[in-house]
From Swiss-Prot:
Its EC number is 2.1.1.192. It comes from Streptomyces griseus subsp. griseus (strain JCM 4626 / CBS 651.72 / NBRC 13350 / KCC S-0626 / ISP 5235). Specifically methylates position 2 of adenine 2503 in 23S rRNA and position 2 of adenine 37 in tRNAs. Binds 1 [4Fe-4S] cluster. The cluster is coordinated with 3 cysteines and an exchangeable S-adenosyl-L-methionine. The keyword Thylakoid does not apply. Belongs to the radical SAM superfamily. RlmN family. This is Probable dual-specificity RNA methyltransferase RlmN. GO terms for molecular function: 4 iron, 4 sulfur cluster binding; metal ion binding; rRNA (adenine(2503)-C2-)-methyltransferase activity; rRNA binding; tRNA (adenine(37)-C2)-methyltransferase activity; tRNA binding. S-adenosyl-L-methionine binds at G184, E185, S218, S241, L242, H243, N317. Coiled coil: none annotated.
Length: 368
């Protein structure tokens, strides 16, 4: 467990590197990898079709590839990357948490949430998190390692397969939104997260053919990475986990604020908004008697007034053994009114999955 305020930007050394998987590779790299096995390069397109369009990673399902070639190609590009340990459901089975065991025994989780008009999937980008926010169960557990691009992508592929096969009831049969809000700080695993976004949004069969506009990437405020992300040309939404409008409190709640303060983080966010044309989501966990005062809502509204922004207030999810708890209803209402008084759009998030430790901030608490 990290010390209070301690930050980990680089994953610990010594972790066994995940094996190479087709989802780690660009279309050109897939052709090279297939050719290296002695097979014709066009097999790469067939494999991509099976994985990204049919969600099939079992060679037995690759019926358009000769049986003698399947094992060789599977060994080269479809290693046993991760396996489902268990699924846990709630909300009449429309919310499902998946506990994954990675190739090295590391555990991560994803959450699939099906609504009448949309389907959202919350995915992990790291095993653990090095940002050490004191109210977040994942942050308190520390960082084990970064996930590979394929380990990130496979969470979504499995979710899309589950929807297609009717494993999660109700609502549309295709993912609408993907949020990088599970375990980890996405921008601390920059290259692999960017690679995952490309696989998710490349047209089928090179990728999953999802819309960039349906993807949200969260960050606690790694300013250099935010500025770099602004230059990628993505149309994803950027969500900034702010949690306090003043540096004095944010230094405590979000320790990375001691590196890049509120003003620097917001300036980087506005640059992303300008370059992407997307409004910024400000994530703010309301914590009783800590950051939920109406005057802080007023200060937040003043900071954000006139900007391309939306404030997403999050009732704090209870974590076993934590001193932190959710705001009183009357304090939440006063905070909302204080922000809205400045013309800033603000809503309170519908939190799902609390009973299965699946909501934001709880993904590591039950397994560590």
């Amino acid at each position: 467990m990290p010390k209070p305020g301690e930050l980990t930007f680089v994953a610990p050394r010594g972790a066994k590197k995940p094996p190479r998987h087709i989802a780690d590779l660009t279309p050109a790299e897939r052709k090279e990898a297939v050719a290296a096995t002695g097979e014709k390069p066009f097999r790469a397109q067939q494999l991509s079709q099976h994985y990204f369009a049919r969600y099939a990673h079992d060679p037995a399902e690759w019926t358009n590839i000769p049986a003698g070639s399947r094992e060789k190609l599977a060994e080269a590009l479809f290693p046993d990357l991760m396996s489902v340990m268990r699924h846990i459901s709630c909300d009449d089975d429309t919310t499902r948490k998946t506990l994954w065991k990675l190739h090295d025994g590391t555990l991560v989780e994803s959450v699939l949430m099906r609504y009448p008009d949309r389907v959202t999937m919350c995915i992990s980008s790291q095993a653990g998190c090095g940002m050490n926010c004191p109210f977040c169960a994942t942050g308190q557990a520390g960082l084990d390692r970064n996930l590979s691009t394929a380990e990130i992508v496979h969470q979504i592929v499995d979710g899309m397969r589950a929807l297609r096969d009717g494993e999660v009831p109700g609502g549309p049969a295709r993912l609408s939104n993907i949020v990088f809000m599970g375990m980890g700080e996405p921008l601390a695993n920059y290259n692999r997260v960017v690679g995952a976004i490309r696989r998710l949004t490349d047209p089928e069969p090179d990728g999953l053919g999802l819309s960039q506009r349906g993807i949200t990437v969260s960050t606690v405020g790694l300013v250099p990475a935010m500025l770099r992300f602004a230059d990628e040309g993505f149309k994803c939404r950027l969500a900034v986990s702010l949690h306090a409008p003043d540096d004095e409190l944010r230094d405590t709640l979000v320790p990375v604020n001691t590196r890049w303060n509120v003003r620097e983080v917001l300036d980087a966010a506005w640059e992303y908004a300008d370059k992407s044309g997307r409004r910024i989501s400000i994530e703010y966990a309301l914590i009783r008697d800590i950051n939920d005062q109406a005057w802080r809502g007023d200060r937040l509204g003043r900071l954000l007034k006139g900007k391309r922004v939306h404030v997403n207030l999050i009732p704090l999810n209870p974590t076993p053994g934590s001193k932190w708890t959710a705001s009183r209803p009357e304090d939440e209402k006063a905070f909302v009114e204080a922000v809205a008084a400045h013309g800033v759009p603000v809503t309170v998030r519908d939190t799902r999955g609390q009973e299965i430790d699946g909501a934001c901030g709880q993904l590591a608490a039950a397994e560590r």
